[in-house]
Amino acid sequence: DADIVVLSAPHQANEQMLVRLAKMKSLRNCLILDTGAVKQPIAKLSARLNFGEGTQFLPTHPMAGKEKAGFENSAAKLFVNHSWFIDESVCLTKLNKTKLYWMTKLLGAKPTYIDNPLHDELMSEISHLPQLISTILGGQVNPYLIPLAGPGLRSMLRLAGSPYSVWSEIIEQNKTDIIKALKLFRDNLGKVTRMIETGQPL
């Protein structure tokens, strides 16, 4: 038996595991949650599944992480003072609500309740777009020049080192919102370019 199951693999693996957990009817009174960066697809999947008695799935997304994967890169205080987005539409049992409270409290996270469509839209702007900008910049800069650069460039390139296997799924699952964010950034970049060309102050 398990009190809490946390799915923290890439999105497709999380979805496959969730289906397997739903078939385990002996898994009772368990709180299952994921930590993926896109919420709508897995939330829609969970709505079609029937779990064991008292077992519930809760879409969540902690706003903390590293660009490097693997247990060797783990950190005990990773979640301290960071927001932890939680699907506000799920009505948890009293038992599972207590589990969620103590888990986030012990990790030092800040629970933030939000609906899934708004979450995915926000992530496209404050997480997914910065990732893509970092990746684009990493592909543009001559790698031989990076050791000569200061901390500004290195900070901007940090996200470019994130595993592509994770980000390729995020881009696919949140494609509509990401494209919208990219187009807005493109328009703003065009405005800045024209201002520089015409000598206007930024």
Where are these regions (language model features)?
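Rossmann-like NAD(P)(H) cofactor-binding subdomain of soluble oxidoreductases
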Residues: 13, 17-72
